[in-house]
């Protein structure tokens, strides 16, 4: 299978985990504590993956300076975008409770939530495509991290959308659209950087890593703590060790 097609396939699969989570939340009422537990575990998995699969490899391939600058830029881009979207009604887009506004309460919030969810998922998909450049195959640890974190993201956000009165067409249109864009982002990450210097690849990888960490701190971890409370840290630690084990065995 051509590498570009693999990038498209893995990115779409990763985005498809959001659709799976959305389907579960729409069909069944999942207890909030279960959602929070899985989300805390997924946050730990992602932290491990971005540390060992992204930042560490970016430093080895392109050096410390491009990695540091890229990481800070990625965090700044996410935080800035998140602040703008929060003003438009997307502040609680990952919340499973009644925090999400309806379109009636906050006109334009539906679009903001959809754009926010897209911004959350794109960096993860880009690094799947970029990872193919380095190893010739998708990173098992990074793929597992994205899949494990995306299911509770889709589940929690959809539960909140449902309570806010969003229609099935809006909910599933949003997640299916993001799955498609995730595939395209992975494809772009591979094709655009196929012949790029190592420093550029390191810089782009670090941008994605910085965005992912900012997303975790601003959205996933607060949602996990809301219901899971004192066990959030322990559950995240188990997730971290699980991803590190996959990385160590796979490496």
PLM-predicted stretches and their roles:
Residues 1-251:
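Intrinsically disordered, metal-sensing/regulatory segments
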């Amino acid at each position: 299978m051509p590498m570009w097609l693999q990038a498209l396939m893995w990115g779409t699969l990763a985005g498809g985990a959001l659709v799976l989570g959305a389907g579960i939340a729409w069909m069944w009422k999942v207890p909030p504590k279960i959602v929070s537990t899985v989300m805390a575990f997924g946050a730990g998995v992602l932290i491990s993956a971005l540390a060992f699969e992204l930042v560490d490899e970016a430093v080895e391939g392109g050096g410390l300076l491009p990695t540091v600058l890229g990481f800070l830029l990625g965090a700044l881009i996410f935080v800035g975008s998140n602040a703008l979207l929060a003003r438009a009604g997307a502040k609680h887009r990952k919340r499973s409770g009644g925090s999400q506004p309806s379109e009636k309460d906050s006109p334009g919030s539906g679009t903001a939530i959809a754009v926010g969810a897209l911004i959350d998922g794109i960096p993860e998909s880009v690094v799947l495509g970029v990872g193919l450049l380095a190893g010739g195959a998708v990173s098992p640890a990074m793929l597992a991290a994205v899949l494990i974190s995306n299911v509770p993201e889709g589940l929690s956000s959809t539960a909140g959308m449902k309570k806010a009165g969003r229609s099935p067409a809006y909910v599933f249109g949003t997640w299916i659209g993001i799955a498609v864009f995730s595939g395209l982002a992975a494809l772009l990450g591979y094709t655009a950087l196929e012949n790029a210097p190592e420093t550029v690849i390191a810089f782009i990888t670090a941008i994605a890593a910085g965005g992912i960490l900012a997303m975790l701190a601003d959205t996933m971890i607060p949602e996990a703590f809301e219901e899971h409370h004192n066990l959030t840290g322990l559950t995240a630690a188990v997730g971290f060790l699980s991803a590190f084990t996959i990385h160590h065995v796979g490496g």
